[in-house]
């Protein structure tokens, strides 16, 4: 046996006794070994020996169930608890349980919000996306203008296709603008300055800044 293991074994009775008194619940030798092994480096033989020694000295109680022995602290050493104290503890437990449940629910809401925010576009990505959409919208607006001006060269089917595409991109424009607005609002909830200052700091330009109006459907 190594020196450190021997020292741990010598102090095992005190460690085991203190553990059983602090926990004040029944344990098997395997339970005590599993719970103390990592922190104190106790071997199973040392734990079993300490439990038997403490039981023989009357410092802990021992019960045999079939082939298994159960050990627990001597209850005579603890103060008697009144019914009023028990009821008070029950009330405290219920209050703390309700508080924990409320905190857990808040954590779930915050995790859901965080997941939504992390899956959304970043500010630079939004800026790039907005610029691309503006360019794309300008191209289609110009194309539509030319098509309207040259009705003799456009079939009804082509005209209908262009109108459908226009409706599609207008819908996408509204959708992305709404997403951007919601994301900015979520960020602004924890932002110490005004919305205008936030937009100036990150370089966000709105449709209104350029007098751009979303076309009618």
Curated annotation (Swiss-Prot):
Post-translational modification: Phosphorylated by PKA, PKC and MAPK.
Location of the protein in the cell: Nucleus
Ranges where the record places region DNA-binding: 118-182
Gene Ontology MF: a single term: nuclear retinoid X receptor binding
GO aspect biological process, one term: androgen receptor signaling pathway
Coiled coil: 93-153
Keywords: Coiled coil, DNA recombination, DNA-binding, Meiosis, Nucleus
Region Interaction with NR3C1 decreased when missing, residue ranges: 118-182
Presence of keyword Iron: no
GO cellular component, one term: DNA recombinase auxiliary factor complex
Gene3D superfamilies per UniProt: Winged helix-like DNA-binding domain superfamily/Winged helix DNA-binding domain
Pfam families in alphabetical order: LZ3wCH, TBPIP
Stretches the record annotates as Interaction with NR3C1, homodimerization and transcriptional activation almost abolished when missing: 89-117
InterPro entries per record: Hop2_WH_dom (IPR010776), LZ3wCH (IPR040661), WH-like_DNA-bd_sf (IPR036388), WH_DNA-bd_sf (IPR036390)
Predominant location category: nucleus
Function, as annotated: Plays an important role in meiotic recombination. Stimulates DMC1-mediated strand exchange required for pairing homologous chromosomes during meiosis. The complex PSMC3IP/MND1 binds DNA, stimulates the recombinase activity of DMC1 as well as DMC1 D-loop formation from double-strand DNA. This complex stabilizes presynaptic RAD51 and DMC1 filaments formed on single strand DNA to capture double-strand DNA. This complex stimulates both synaptic and presynaptic critical steps in RAD51 and DMC1-promoted homologous pairing.
Subunit structure comment from the entry: Forms a stable heterodimer with MND1. Interacts with PSMC3/TBP1. Interacts with the DNA-binding domain of the nuclear receptors NR3C1/GR, ESR2/ER-beta, THRB and RXRA.
Family the UniProt entry places it in: Belongs to the HOP2 family.
The protein's name: Homologous-pairing protein 2 homolog
UniProt organism field: Rattus norvegicus
Lineage, top ranks: Eukaryota, Metazoa, Chordata, Craniata, Vertebrata
């Amino acid at each position: 046996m190594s020196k450190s293991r021997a020292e741990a074994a010598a102090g095992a009775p005190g460690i085991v006794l203190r553990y059983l008194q602090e926990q004040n619940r029944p344990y098997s030798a395997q339970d005590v070994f599993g719970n103390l092994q990592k922190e104190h480096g106790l071997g199973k033989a040392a734990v079993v020996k300490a439990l038997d020694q403490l039981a023989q000295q009357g410092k802990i109680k021992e019960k045999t169930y079939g082939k298994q022995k159960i050990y627990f602290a001597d209850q005579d050493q603890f103060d008697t608890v009144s019914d009023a104290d028990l009821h008070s503890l029950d009330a405290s437990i219920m209050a703390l349980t309700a508080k924990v449940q409320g905190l857990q629910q808040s954590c779930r809401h915050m995790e859901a919000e965080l997941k939504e925010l992390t899956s959304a576009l970043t500010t630079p990505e939004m800026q790039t996306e907005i610029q691309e959409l503006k360019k794309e919208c300008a191209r289609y607006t110009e194309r539509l203008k030319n098509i309207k001006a040259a009705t003799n060269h456009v079939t009804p089917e082509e005209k209908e296709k262009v109108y459908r595409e226009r409706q599609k991109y207008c819908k996408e424009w509204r959708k992305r603008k709404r997403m951007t607005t919601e994301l900015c609002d979520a960020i602004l909830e924890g932002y110490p300055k005004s919305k205008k200052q936030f937009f100036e700091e990150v370089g966000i330009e709105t449709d209104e800044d350029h007098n751009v109006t979303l076309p009618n459907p």
